[in-house]
């Protein structure tokens, strides 16, 4: 199964890159306590995550219940997230996460265009109890994933998706989910406005 989360890796300048990414989990690698021991990452060539892990084969994978933070990480605008030093590796942990898995690469296949990396968990942080995701959080996640492909998806398709997901926000969102939803809508409007002024191509 693929679990959506946020990855921190170390840039060349020593600062952390924060990026949303799915981790592939084999259920046989989940311990009796529910914690991971291994997982797989598949970053694309050209991404900052690909570069960082090829240069420094370690990082931290986070599970979140903060829909806005996940959206910002996916859309490359999470630079103001609160970080604290990792304990085992040279890197950083997102303070506002539920679980943080410090890892080192155990096996690596850098075949392009997408690497296949097996990560071994070397330290687990249980920052708070996991309460689960509600329908509004899933709505933010779905629109966010779509927004990462805004250059290839028509505005009309986005408007249909927004219309479909909006009731979930109205019925089940708390403050964080509403903030995440508003952030993605503002991100899209900004992209489309720049497209009209010649800053982007738009479908």
Predicted regions and their residues:
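Basic, polyanion-binding surface patches
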Residues: 1-100, 104-203
């Amino acid at each position: 199964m693929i679990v959506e989360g946020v990855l921190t890796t170390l840039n060349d300048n020593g600062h952390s890159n924060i990026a949303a990414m799915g981790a592939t989990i084999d259920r046989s690698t989940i311990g009796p306590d529910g914690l991971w021991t291994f997982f797989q990452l598949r970053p694309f060539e050209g991404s900052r995550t690909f570069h960082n892990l090829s240069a420094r084969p370690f990082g931290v994978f986070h599970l979140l219940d903060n829909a806005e933070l996940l959206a910002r990480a996916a859309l490359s605008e999470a630079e103001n997230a609160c970080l604290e030093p990792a304990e085992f590796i040279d890197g950083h942990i997102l303070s506002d996460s539920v679980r943080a898995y410090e890892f080192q690469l155990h096996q690596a296949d850098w075949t392009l265009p997408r690497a296949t990396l097996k990560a071994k968990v070397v330290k687990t942080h249980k920052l708070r109890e996991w309460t689960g995701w509600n329908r509004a959080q899933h709505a933010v996640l779905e629109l966010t994933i779509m927004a990462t492909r805004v250059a290839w998806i028509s505005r009309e398709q986005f408007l249909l998706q927004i219309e479909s997901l909006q009731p979930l926000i109205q019925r089940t969102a708390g403050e964080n989910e509403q903030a995440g939803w508003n952030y993605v809508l503002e991100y899209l409007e900004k992209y489309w406005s720049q497209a009209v002024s010649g800053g982007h191509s738009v479908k």
